[in-house]
Amino acid sequence: MLTETELIVLGAVRYSDNASIVSTYSECFGALSFKCIRSASRRRGQANAFFVPLSILKVTLDYLPNRGIQLPKEQELLHRPIRPSIEPVANAVALFTVELLTRLLRSSGADRALYRYLREEIKGLEHLSDKGISSFHLRLMTGLLHHLGILPQSETYRPSSVLDFSEGTFRPSWSPEEQGKAYASSLLYQFISSPAPEELPLSGQERNLLLKLLLDFLGYHFPDLGNLKSPEILSQLF
């Protein structure tokens, strides 16, 4: 039976001279890969858009659960990100977003609420201020914590407390080493308790501190996340 679903493009690998395998996260099926054929009659710009990471497509396909690579009948471009192609900071946060989502969602099932959150965040990237763009990846990650069910309990925060990874709460530090992590925990508290966290006046060093804490926390709960390469690019920009 033919099914229509939206999806977010996460990457593409050339399969042949006129086809690529596109990796995505879809609204109806979760992680999904499909073969995209470059039609000779299709305008080159429109065809290339199907391979741009963070593009949003609508596809019609005869979905077969046991088929690793799906074969869509129709594809329609709904949204193509523009700022990452013309702004270095937007490009860096987009690269990070793609790498993070690819690692986190590569074997995930359908989660419509998560998909819709990601769709709106990606579309909203085009309208953020310069300050907001610089913190987009941090806002996205804190939102992911909520949708993945591991958002720390902000009501447990007290000044100089640290994030307890196993409990998902803030607690007093137990050692001098932990005291050094209290500042990053305070930044996380600000982010999860602010209505517009991307507009918080953070320095580059503060963004990198918070990014490391968020990655460590995600890695604790999702060990397959591994070490990402793109944070190094972000640290150089900030």
Regions found by a protein language model. Give the residues of each.
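Non-catalytic alpha-helical scaffolds and adjoining flexible linkers that form interface surfaces
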Residues: 1-21, 25-238
